[in-house]
């Protein structure tokens, strides 16, 4: 997997470190080259470094979203897999190598087991939480609200009120 060379063009402005292409066709060709670099699975950081600016980053991100929006395309390629927290295969290999150097080969299996147990407990807690939410939504959604007590008067209260008022007036 090789990288495409970045061409520079002579420029009259000295304020910019990047030179502008002499015509619009060359600009479209450069944008297509950046899109190929992004579609090849390079990270956006690397493609913005190759193109030399934030404008290239926007083009690379747009090209990546267009390339990944197809029905069967899943960002393939050996270097294109962003597996965990945006880390690719090379980053994970470096992290594993540093961990092997720091902890040593005897402690690595123990550390791996403890990390696995922690991840398993988090997954179990998430499943329990999800089942509780489903259970609550199933219980509360189908039943009508409980009936409220309504005061039904049979006329007995009115007779008592009349009797008490007549006693007071006497």
UniProtKB/Swiss-Prot annotation:
Taxonomy, superkingdom: Eukaryota
Topology in the lipid bilayer: Single-pass membrane protein
GO biological process: protein transport by the Tat complex
Keywords attached to this entry: Chloroplast, Membrane, Plastid, Protein transport, Thylakoid, Transit peptide, Translocation, Transmembrane, Transmembrane helix, Transport
UniProt entry tagged with the keyword Transmembrane: yes
Lumenal compartment spans: 67-83
Transit peptide: 1-66
TM regions (residue ranges): 84-104
The protein's assembly and partners: In thylakoid membranes, TATC and TATB form a large receptor complex, containing about eight TATC-TATB pairs, which binds the precursor protein. Twin arginine signal peptide promotes pH-triggered docking of TATA oligomers to TATC-TATB receptor complex, inducing a conformational switch of TATA that results in activation of the translocase. TATA dissociates from TATC-TATB upon completion of translocation.
PANTHER family, per the entry: SEC-INDEPENDENT PROTEIN TRANSLOCASE PROTEIN TATA, CHLOROPLASTIC (PTHR33162:SF1)
Protein name (record): Sec-independent protein translocase protein TATA, chloroplastic
Source species of the chain: Oryza sativa subsp. japonica (Rice)
Lineage of the organism: Eukaryota, Viridiplantae, Streptophyta, Embryophyta, Tracheophyta
